[in-house]
Amino acid sequence: MSLLTEVETPTRNEWECRCSDSSDPLIVAASIIGILHLILWILDRLFFKCIYRRLKYGLKRGPSTAGVPESMREEYRQEQQSAVDVDDGHFVNIELE
């Protein structure tokens, strides 16, 4: 009799394991935690850009414009756009020796 036949008894399905203590609550809890961990890891890898962008920037989408007149909204948009615009003619070349 070999050690393999004493420890593990193969079944017909090849996926099942005949363990006398497989109904142990600790084994069941570990299996559930392992499956949940796998599911969360897969979801994290699928949606990591959305998740971490949401954590980094929060739920904010910008300042609220409720109650602000349309003329002030347009002025704010123009200020934001002008802050983004860059004049390409003002570059400085620095040469290191």
From Swiss-Prot:
Region (Disordered): 62-83
Keyword Ion transport listed: yes
One of the record's GO cellular component terms: virion membrane
Subcellular location, record wording: Virion membrane; Host apical cell membrane
GO molecular function: monoatomic ion channel activity; proton transmembrane transporter activity
In-chain residues carrying the UniProt-annotated modification Phosphoserine: 64, 82
Residues the record marks as site: Seems to be involved in pH gating: 41
The keyword Membrane belongs to this UniProt entry's keyword annotation: yes
Lipid-modified sites (S-palmitoyl cysteine): 50
UniProt superkingdom: Viruses
Transmembrane segments: 23-43
One of the protein's GO biological processes: symbiont genome entry into host cell via pore formation in plasma membrane
Pfam families per record: Flu_M2
Positions bearing the site annotation: Essential for channel activity, possibly by being protonated during channel activation, and by forming the channel gate and the selective filter: 37
Regulation: The M2 protein from most influenza A strains is inhibited by amantadine and rimantadine, resulting in viral uncoating incapacity. Emergence of amantadine-resistant variants is usually rapid.
Virion surface-side positions: 1-22
Main subcellular localisation: virion
Record keywords, A-Z: Disulfide bond, Host cell membrane, Host membrane, Host-virus interaction, Hydrogen ion transport, Inhibition of host autophagy by virus, Ion channel, Ion transport, Lipoprotein, Membrane, Palmitate, Phosphoprotein, Signal-anchor, Transmembrane, Transmembrane helix, Transport, Viral ion channel, Virion
Domain notes: Cytoplasmic tail plays an important role in virion assembly and morphogenesis.
UniProt record similarity statement: Belongs to the influenza viruses matrix protein M2 family.
Subunit details: Homotetramer; composed of two disulfide-linked dimers held together by non-covalent interactions. May interact with matrix protein 1.
Miscellaneous field: When the channel is activated, one or more imidazole moieties of His-37 probably become bi-protonated.
HAMAP family, sorted: INFV_M2
Name of the protein: Matrix protein 2
